[in-house]
Structure formats: structure tokens, C-alpha cells
């Protein structure tokens, strides 16, 4: 399970206020019931803030296809801070970002049947310099800063 997007220096023109995730017709994904009264957020894979240049682009980030059951502390903490850093990096060059969801043996399955990823890996390609930076997070409350999650992957 993965998602790929391009991050460029887009001007913020719209806000996400009041938006919520919706189902994509004909595709079975998690839904609002999977996030009810537990520690998981609807974690954006392609961040809403990266696509807030237009309502159309922003709206595309609010499909359940673009979210994962993400530990709330990870989503609101180190993952969010890495997303903010991406937006700084894309001020000077275009980024291609691939987010991998990893389901290790014994991954959590909720009562609703939804699968919780064990890990999330963000591969960021800096198109101007031709380099990769990769960050791997266990889907738990982080105990170190996002910078400490950088790993070496061969691409």
C-alpha cells in the first residue's frame, strides 16, 4: 500500500476548515467508523496543507484513499513536523514523495476489520539535487524527533 505525490511551492489560497474525509465511489477503504473512540487519526498520506492552493486540490486530499489509521501522537507530532519541513524544502526544489504503509506480521486489525499499518515510510526525492531522504516511523507515539527517523534506502 503506497501513495505518491509531487510537492511544489504552491501558494496557500484556501483553508481546510469544516472538511472531512469522504469515500471514493466503488473503492473499499477505511471509513469514519474505523476512527471512532480510539487512538488513531485519519492521517493524511498526501498532506492537505501541501495542496491548499485550490479547493479542487485540497478536496482531493480528503478521500479515505488518502489516509491511514495513524497513531494520533505520530500524526499530530513528528509526522506533521516532517510535512512542514517538506513545505520548506519545496520552496527551492520540487519533491516527489512516496509514502509506503507497512503491515508487519501481527499488525493490528480493529473490531471494524480495518488494518492498522505497523510502520510508515516516507521516501522524498529532491528533483533538483537528485538525492533521496527517507524517514521510517513505527505507528506508535514517537519518543524521538522526526530527524532521528531518517534511514538509508537504496533507490
What are these model-predicted stretches?
Residues 1-30:
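Glycine/proline-rich, flexible active-site/cofactor-binding loop segments
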Residues 23-155:
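Domain-level detector of nuclease and nuclease-like folds
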